[in-house]
UniProtKB/Swiss-Prot annotation:
One GO CC term, this protein: cytoplasm
Source organism per UniProt: Saccharomyces cerevisiae (strain ATCC 204508 / S288c)
Job description of the protein: Catalyzes the dehydration of the S-form of NAD(P)HX at the expense of ATP, which is converted to ADP. Together with NAD(P)HX epimerase, which catalyzes the epimerization of the S- and R-forms, the enzyme allows the repair of both epimers of NAD(P)HX, a damaged form of NAD(P)H that is a result of enzymatic or heat-dependent hydration.
Lineage: Eukaryota, Fungi, Dikarya, Ascomycota, Saccharomycotina
Gene this chain is encoded by: NNR2
Localization of this protein: Cytoplasm
Residues recorded as bearing Phosphoserine in the entry: 6
Name of the molecule in the record: ATP-dependent (S)-NAD(P)H-hydrate dehydratase
Length: 337
């Protein structure tokens, strides 16, 4: 059981079981995976960038961003390393555009993606939220929910407000949906499921079990709740920073999504044998996808916390999101080689 392992043991296990090796035989997208961040609107362009940039710096082979039309050029200007698709529209968009055609473009891209992040910089425009609902439905119906979803920010707002979305998430395979609420969003989720627990941990487990998902509650310690049992909860108390910057949660979604893409390469696609990672056949594998996903979330939390610690050490109160986000690559290398 993962909850019985120490921090060092969990990180070592993630390195051995979740992260595929880089081998000459692998083609582009096979080892590092393909991740898509869905978010970004006229008012919020930084959040999807920080999530996508963290994913890319983690080693993702191909990182896409699907955003609202007005956010596209801005996000593209930040870096040439991301593929940015301005396919979403807000309700007040005056462009003459065929939304069915835009939906086809989105679905065509999703068919090639291994992990989807929903929410960074999304906003709460009704047409944007409807597009997200359509995406959640499409992945469930076309791909049987096998493409993991990492849902944050206004994606969580949609979950709390739309009962049909909640029902769809319940139909995804266990552990294929990861929710990453902060303390306020966690309370909203508690209210949305209409259940009460005797303790904070029990409430986290109730949310995870009710929605058939993994819940990563961000806080002084990050708590990762399993859809299986309260006993399976993981707690990450590694040192971070005393300053919280906007965008730290976006860095976390990027780190988690890339770890999930790595885990899919190992668990779903089985791209290499144990011997290719230098492992013994006597090594016990993780039991199932939920174990891989829980461990991926733990690793993502560790990376984000260490980036935050280093950023704060270097800049103190002046630390900005870029000061931690740009450290993702070096921290990943330090932890996992």
């Amino acid at each position: 059981m993962l909850a019985e392992l120490s921090h060092r043991e969990l990180i070592k296990l993630a390195q051995k079981r979740c992260i595929p090796p880089l081998l000459p035989k692998f083609h582009k997208g096979q080892s590092g995976g393909r991740v898509c961040i869905i978010g970004g609107c006229e008012d919020y362009t930084g959040a999807p960038y920080f999530s996508a940039n963290a994913t890319a710096l983690m080693g993702c082979d191909l990182t896409h961003v699907i955003c609202e039309y007005n956010a596209g050029t801005v996000i593209k200007s930040y870096t040439p390393n991301l593929m940015v698709h301005p396919y979403l529209r807000m309700s007040n968009t005056k462009l003459d555009v065929d939304m069915d055609e835009q939906r086809k473009k989105i679905n065509s891209l999703l068919d090639r993606i291994h992990v989807v992040v929903i929410g960074p910089g999304l906003g709460r425009d009704p047409l944007m939220l409807k597009s997200i609902k359509d995406i959640i439905r499409y992945i469930l119906e076309k791909h049987e929910g096998k493409i993991p979803l990492v849902i944050d920010a206004d994606g969580l707002f949609l979950v709390t407000q739309d009962s049909e979305v909640k029902e769809m998430l319940k139909s995804y395979p266990k552990g294929r949906v990861i929710l990453t609420p902060n303390v306020v969003e966690f309370k909203r989720l508690c209210d949305a499921i209409g259940k009460k627990g005797d303790s904070h941990s029990e409430m986290g487990s109730l949310i995870a079990q009710e929605l058939n998902c993994i819940v990563v509650e961000k806080g002084q310690s990050d708590k990762i709740f399993s859809p299986d049992s309260e006993k399976d909860m993981l707690t990450n108390s590694e040192e971070g920073s005393n300053k919280r910057v906007g965008g730290q949660g976006d860095t976390l979604t990027g780190a988690i999504s890339c770890m999930l893409a790595f885990s899919r390469a190992m668990y779903d696609f089985k791209i290499c044998e144990q011997e290719e990672k230098g492992e013994s056949s006597n090594d016990k594998p993780l039991k199932n996808w939920v174990d891989y996903a829980m461990l991926s979330c733990y690793a993502g939390c560790t990376i984000t916390r260490e980036c935050s610690r280093l950023g704060f050490k270097a800049k103190g109160r002046a630390m900005q999101t870029t000061d931690l986000n740009d450290r993702v690559g070096e921290v990943f290398a330090k932890l996992f080689g």
